[in-house]
A protein has these predicted regions:
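Proline/glycine-anchored alpha-helix kink/cap motifs
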Residues: 19-23, 88-96, 132-134, 247, ...
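Non-catalytic terminal/interface segments that mediate subunit docking, oligomerization
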Residues: 31, 213-315, 320-330, 407-411, ...
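Acidic, glycine-rich active-site loops and adjacent beta-strand->loop/helix elements
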Residues: 36-41, 108-115, 136-142, 184-185, ...
Length: 426
């Protein structure tokens, strides 16, 4: 990981849990779906890819996420949060219809339990009348620390203070709740996993385990937010740092400015803003659609929200972009990070679709800076813009030469007498 980059802390936290799953279940005959999928490294090492693990996240190498074409041990491809229970239900229902007999497991982090898709799937559990095992990997983190009411419920259960109503919440969905177990202790985990497997023959089970993100590596344990994703050293400056600096400076002068994010405060560079203006900073958890509607509603009351999000995750809120923000022509600014080709995380995290799906949206102005200086200027301009702007930018860039920003006009960098015109966006 130090050479190729990748997700470090989240994978260190599930080593024992993954070993237990492979010990108790028979993969690939049994099927496992990893929610998000970034915590699958130990699974890959224990299946058929140990010898190829040095090629992780490289061209021609193994993916940093589950990949069906890579191995029969990867039964479903993931990359975004909240999909695992829906996928597990689909696999289990197909199993039932074909008269087959194998176990289906969804490994889901507590951060994903903020996502609405999880509850849509749970609501279908009784309707579909099938059996799955949900392993709730509770480490109190997504990329940032988990937030909200669901986090409080899970915390009460971990501390042994949870009322019966908390357990009943899961059982109302048709799940037999088991917990809470130490997911980093095989002596405790293996018997619990065996019991869950035996119960699975007649009912669906939720096995609640706690793990420590970054387990076994002191620096990761102390700063799991900083080591969730690790990149090889790079020389470029990051746009996200400029976003945090510029928004904080703008907010000092304009009390209408608020920041909204979906569980990615640090990755998007918003920590300075959150520290300076906690009452105007909103991390809603992994709830991209909700964050978009929240931004729209804030704008209807005279606030100027900046919704910062990775390009790949904005796809999840497309209906809300069209209907709630742009349909009402509201001055909510989309700060779209990791736009364009993003490299080693694979196709699930490329930011290559946003320009195509945003271009037809009414009332939306799309801005693409050529350097960080221009990005700062676009942010300043957006603070007084009366309609929704979308500023899309890559991870890294150079501060560059400042060019005046005019809406609806290209900057002419070079002109000669030929009949050839080259347009460059960004």
């Amino acid at each position: 990981v130090s050479v190729r980059g990748g997700h470090l802390a989240s994978n260190l936290g599930v080593v024992e849990l993954t070993v237990a799953l492979h010990r108790v279940f028979c993969f690939p005959e049994d099927k496992i779906v990893f929610d998000v999928g970034h915590q699958c490294y130990a699974h890959k090492l224990l299946s058929d890819r140990a010898e190829r693990f040095s090629t992780l996240r490289s061209r021609g190498g193994i993916s940093g996420f589950p990949k069906r074409s890579e191995s029969p041990y990867d039964s479903y491809e993931t990359g975004h949060a909240g999909t695992a229970i829906s996928a597990a239900l689909g696999i289990a229902k197909a199993r039932d219809l074909k008269g087959e007999d194998f176990c289906v497991i969804a490994l889901v982090g507590d951060g994903s339990f903020n996502n609405g898709l999880i509850y849509e799937a749970l609501n279908s559990l009784k309707i579909l009348k099938t059996r799955i095992l949900i392993v709730l990997n509770d480490n109190g983190m997504s990329i940032s620390p988990t937030v909200g009411g669901t986090h409080e419920v899970l915390s009460e259960l971990k501390e042994g203070n949870g009322p019966l109503a908390d357990v009943a919440l899961f059982e109302r969905y048709g799940l037999h709740y088991m917990g809470v177990y130490n997911g980093n202790d095989l002596s405790e985990l293996l018997p619990a996993m065996e019991q869950a497997k035996s119960l699975l023959s007649t009912q669906s089970v939720l096995l609640h385990v706690t793990t420590r993100k970054g387990q076994g590596y002191v620096f990761c344990e102390q700063r799991p937010d900083r080591t969730h994703g690790v990149s090889p050293n790079r020389p470029g400056k990051e746009y996200s740092a400029a976003l945090g600096e510029e928004l904080t400076a703008l907010a000092e002068k304009d009390p209408r400015i608020v920041a909204v994010t979906a569980a990615m405060t640090d990755s998007l560079g918003l920590r300075p803003f959150f520290n300076a203006f906690p009452e105007r900073a909103f991390d809603v958890g992994i709830c991209e659609e909700h964050a978009c509607v929240l931004s729209a509603a804030l704008a209807t009351e005279g606030m100027h929200p900046y919704y910062a999000i990775y390009s790949t995750f904005l796809q999840r809120a497309y209906d809300e972009v069209i209907h709630d923000v742009c349909g009402q022509n509201l001055p909510a600014t989309f700060c779209i990070d990791r736009a364009g080709i993003t490299g080693a995380d694979g196709e699930t995290h490329q930011g290559v679709f946003d320009l195509s799906y945003l271009a037809p949206v009414p009332n939306l102005t799309i801005a693409i800076p050529s350097n960080i200086s221009e990005f700062r200027a676009m942010l300043r301009l957006s603070a007084s813009y009366p309609a929704p702007p979308a500023i899309r930018y890559p991870r890294e860039g150079e501060e560059g030469e400042f060019l005046p920003v005019e809406i609806g006009k290209f900057a002419v960098l070079r002109s000669n007498t030929t009949d050839i015109i080259i347009y460059a966006a960004g």
